[in-house]
């Protein structure tokens, strides 16, 4: 069974390539969510880093304190690495971590000449509790309380979820406090939705996600964008010919009968300007579920099984799939041609 390595960073800004981690909180939990080890650590501000005023306000830090911390950024990184080197086959858990904390994590390891991909190698996987919370709310909204903001839109910020679900959270944006609340939230959701948690953990494996999508052919895809849930019933089409971590699907609320007859030039125009297609990044823990979830919701509820199956068969058209592959290659080539020709700074070359 896997341990859970829950973590959170407080930083000088939002740019993982140039900003710095000022606070790092790590708590190791066993398979029963009992605490095993804890690391709460800070670093001294690097002389070449200018912190964002907004970041300092959010994190309740001042310049004098971050300039007088005992440990350097390098020393903090070594302490983190020493702790984590004891653990393998673990889940790295965070809140909105795949899009934020993980990029900082990789950057600080890489900049200090350490292997940067700890979270998804050596049997390790990633669990982003933000994805779990939004998934649960989309399909079982009585399992989690979510407040609305001043504009009347649902709000999934960690401190707001803590308040609406009655968690004690006195030190929001203190790294170790954020870790503790993230795990409280995950435990509450597990207790109420053990089946969805199983689904959530399976989505953390790139290999399992790909196998599931290919084998099931039709599935539910959930995204949370711009303060709203987006639920799609999707038919898997092909793997991206250039970007191997992307699968391409078709939104089954649309009729493909005419589309499959297009040549690749006409299809390219549709691909660019319409929302028929869905890109699934299988290495970013996408929210993939059984087709029954989307099938029970509008607009897919209006279609019969026979209508869905007809679309499924139409989209298996060999010439259409070959044309789609041409379209994807063309898109990739145009992206490469339009990409900035400026030589990147060294800090920006982690994926080069």
Cite the ranges covered by each PLM segment.
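Conserved non-catalytic scaffold segment of RNase H-like nuclease domains
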Residues: 1-114, 119, 155, 159-165, ...
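Short, glycine/acidic-enriched loop or turn micro-motifs at the edges of active sites
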Residues: 11-13, 99, 131, 181, ...
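A short, structural micro-pattern
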Residues: 20, 35, 121-123, 241-246
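Short loop/turn segments at secondary-structure transitions that flank enzyme active sites
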Residues: 47, 133-135, 189-192, 255-258
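A general structural signal for short secondary-structure junctions and capping/turn motifs
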Residues: 83-84, 173, 237-241
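Acidic, Mg2+-coordinating catalytic module of metal-dependent nucleases/exonucleases
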Residues: 91-96, 100, 104, 142-207
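Short alpha-helix plus adjacent loop in nuclease-associated cores
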Residues: 121-148
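Acidic catalytic cores of enzymes that act on phosphate-bearing nucleotides/polynucleotides
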Residues: 203-280
């Amino acid at each position: 069974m896997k341990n859970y390595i829950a973590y959170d960073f407080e930083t000088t800004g939002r740019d993982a390539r140039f900003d710095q981690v000022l606070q790092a909180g790590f708590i190791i939990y066993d398979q029963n969510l009992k605490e095993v080890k804890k690391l709460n650590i800070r670093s001294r501000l690097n002389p070449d880093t200018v912190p964002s005023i907004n970041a300092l306000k959010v994190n309740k830090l001042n310049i004098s304190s971050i300039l007088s911390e005992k440990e350097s950024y390098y020393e903090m990184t070594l302490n983190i690495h020493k702790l984590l080197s004891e653990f393998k086959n673990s889940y790295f858990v965070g809140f909105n971590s795949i899009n934020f904390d993980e990029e900082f994590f990789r950057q600080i390891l890489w900049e200090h000449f350490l292997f940067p991909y700890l979270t998804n190698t050596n049997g390790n996987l990633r669990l982003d509790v933000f994805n779990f919370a939004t998934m649960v709310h989309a399909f079982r909204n009585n399992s989690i309380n979510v407040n609305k903001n001043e504009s009347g839109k649902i709000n999934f910020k960690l401190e707001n979820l803590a308040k609406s679900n009655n968690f004690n959270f006195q030190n929001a944006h203190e790294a170790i406090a954020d870790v503790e609340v993230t795990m409280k939230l995950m435990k509450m959701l597990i207790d109420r939705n053990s089946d969805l948690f199983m689904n959530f953990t399976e989505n953390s494996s790139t290999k399992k996600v790909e196998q599931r999508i290919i084998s099931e052919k039709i599935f539910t895809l959930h995204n949370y964008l711009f303060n709203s849930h987006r639920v799609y019933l999707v038919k898997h089409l092909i793997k991206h010919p250039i970007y191997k971590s992307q699968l391409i699907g078709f939104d089954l609320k649309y009729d493909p009968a005419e589309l499959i007859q297009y040549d690749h030039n006409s299809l390219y125009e549709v691909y660019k300007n319409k929302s028929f297609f869905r890109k699934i990044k299988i290495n970013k823990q996408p929210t993939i579920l059984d087709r029954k979830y989307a099938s029970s919701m509008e607009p897919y509820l209006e279609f019969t099984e026979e209508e869905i199956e007809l679309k499924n068969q139409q989209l298996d058209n060999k010439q259409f799939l070959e044309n789609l592959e041409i379209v994807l290659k063309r898109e990739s080539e145009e992206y490469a041609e339009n990409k900035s020709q400026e030589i990147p700074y060294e800090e920006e070359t982690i994926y080069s």
